[in-house]
């Protein structure tokens, strides 16, 4: 089991590092620019990808496997990871599953269309402290589920 972080604009990297360290997991921090990572942990691996669209997503989708965990706010990337047998967790603690990913993709597309039509403005709610707590719980639950073989 390894953890893959879609690092660009990820507000829970530090929390993910701490949980992964406690479980002695390898963490791949993938982005198109350097982000801070713990220098004293050899299990944390920084991956810098080109600045082309979806380069980080493509790298993660190519390298992730069954039993791994992806941390991302990108719903299409979460869907790609699920197809490979990995777990996917949003940065607000929402666990994406085979049962929920279709609805999440549909809502994403609907909101994009409504924004383009001017029917709604803005994006998702700001990241809140409760999101951090939900994320920590979701990551721990995902790790335990993989360890139990689910």
Curated annotation (Swiss-Prot):
Top-level taxon in the UniProt lineage: Bacteria
Q: Which InterPro entries match?
A: UPF0178
Pfam families the UniProt entry points to: DUF188
Q: Which protein family is named in the record?
A: Belongs to the UPF0178 family.
Name this protein carries in UniProt: UPF0178 protein Rru_A0086
Identify the species of origin. Answer: Rhodospirillum rubrum (strain ATCC 11170 / ATH 1.1.1 / DSM 467 / LMG 4362 / NCIMB 8255 / S1)
């Amino acid at each position: 089991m390894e953890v893959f972080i879609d690092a660009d604009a990820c507000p829970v990297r530090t929390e993910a590092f701490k949980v992964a360290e406690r479980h002695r997991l390898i963490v791949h921090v993938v982005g198109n620019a350097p982000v801070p990572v713990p220098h004293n942990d050899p299990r944390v691996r920084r991956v810098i990808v080109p600045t082309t669209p979806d380069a980080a997503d493509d790298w993660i989708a190519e390298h992730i496997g069954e039993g791994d965990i992806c941390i991302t706010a990108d719903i299409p990337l979460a869907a790609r990871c699920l197809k490979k047998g990995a777990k996917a967790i949003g940065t607000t603690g929402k666990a994406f599953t085979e049962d929920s990913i279709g609805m999440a993709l549909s809502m994403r597309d609907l909101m994009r269309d409504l924004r383009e039509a001017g029917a709604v403005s803005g994006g998702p709610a700001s990241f809140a402290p409760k999101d951090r707590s939900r994320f920590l719980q979701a990551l721990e639950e995902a790790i335990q589920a993989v360890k139990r073989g689910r």
